[in-house]
């Protein structure tokens, strides 16, 4: 009985330590996401920002998210929307390998922060991420001007 209680206490302590570690990683990575948000906000002030974003996105993805760690599926890249899915993610794979898959969600959250800097000209949307249990990480960058023109 005593050993069982000790085992439960140890598991509870370990869970608290993991939660604390995840929160510390969240705090630190959000700092970088906020810097990216500011940089995106500066970029978004430029005229024709969606066209420029669209012209550079595939090169950016190939350079910064290479095929060795990420499997990118391009769905759409036109004047209305840039949409691609990541079918595999190096961040998720590393988190799983190290026994902490829940950590990956922290990195996923930072996309929402960083890309919010593109508003109001470019709206970022997503239905889910691999880290949250979805089949893929979907990235939708919507040209807000084109969307507004439709209505």
What kind of feature is each model-predicted range?
Residues 1-12:
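N-terminal, charged low-complexity regulatory/assembly segments
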Residues 1-3, 46, 101:
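A short, highly charged nucleic-acid-interacting micro-segment common to nuclease
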Residues 3-4, 23, 147-151:
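Terminal "cap-and-tail" regions of soluble proteins that handle hydrophobic small molecules
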Residues 12-99, 112:
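Amphipathic interaction/junction segments at domain boundaries or subunit interfaces
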Residues 80, 90-94, 98-151:
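C-terminal non-catalytic interaction appendages of large macromolecular assemblies
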